[in-house]
Amino acid sequence: MEWRDEGLIIGVRQYGEASVILEAMTRGHGRHLGLVRGGRSQRMRAVLQPGNSAELVWRARLDEQLGTWAIEPTQLRAATLMASAEALHAVGLICALLRLIAERDPHPDLYETAVLIAGHIGDERLAPLLVRLEIEILRETGFGLDLSRCAATGAREDLAYVSPKSGRAVSLAAGAPYRERLLPLPPFLRDEAPGGEPTPQDVLDGFGLTGFFLKRDVFTPRGQGMPEARRAYLAEFSKRQERSATE
């Protein structure tokens, strides 16, 4: 068997003395693993860094086998990652999130979002896209949020909260008596949200929202903690905001 696809490298682990097992998120074949012979060579180590994009050819005698990769890099991002701890941790977070997807299960829209983010990994305005990626991960793992209308009234305007029980939006008026028990819904995640760049607090509220559901519904049931890359990314994001506030 053989197929060709484009992919985003999300992980590498040693296999024997000279080879590695490469994990990639591909457009048409989902999260997929394969052996890269000679993958520990100096030349290949630079190619096989998480966050790089490549044209991939997978070959195996049978579909259920691990198979082997042939790799042609299309975008190397090491220089950007070495220049920014925030970008480095953002890539780590992307990879950790994509590993939540079942192996060999195609998710082309999720792939497109991940590649879009990776392509702008050095952009300091990246954070809202990472929040949206986490929302997509929740949806693709069966825990999608409904942020389109109020769970109590059906209204589509003035949505301000999310119920931690149902994952559904709640309007400002309907949620006012219970606001201490609800999660804030930042404006940039609402359908009727005006244009403009989200504030740092909006972004942190977005991560707080997605983080609550990711921890409760996805990571904890799998016996996993929240990704260290996520904590590190948010720490770097917050430090940058503090520096900006004092300049």
Curated annotation (Swiss-Prot):
A Pfam family per the record: RecO_C
Signal sequence region: none
GO biological process, any: double-strand break repair
InterPro entries reported in the protein's UniProt record: ARFGAP/RecO (IPR037278), DNA_rep/recomb_RecO_N (IPR022572), NA-bd_OB-fold (IPR012340), RecO (IPR003717), RecO_C (IPR042242)
One of the record's GO cellular component terms: bacterial nucleoid
UniProt keywords, alphabetically: DNA damage, DNA recombination, DNA repair
Protein function: Involved in DNA repair and RecF pathway recombination.
PANTHER family tied to this protein: DNA REPAIR PROTEIN RECO
Protein family membership: Belongs to the RecO family.
Name of protein: DNA repair protein RecO
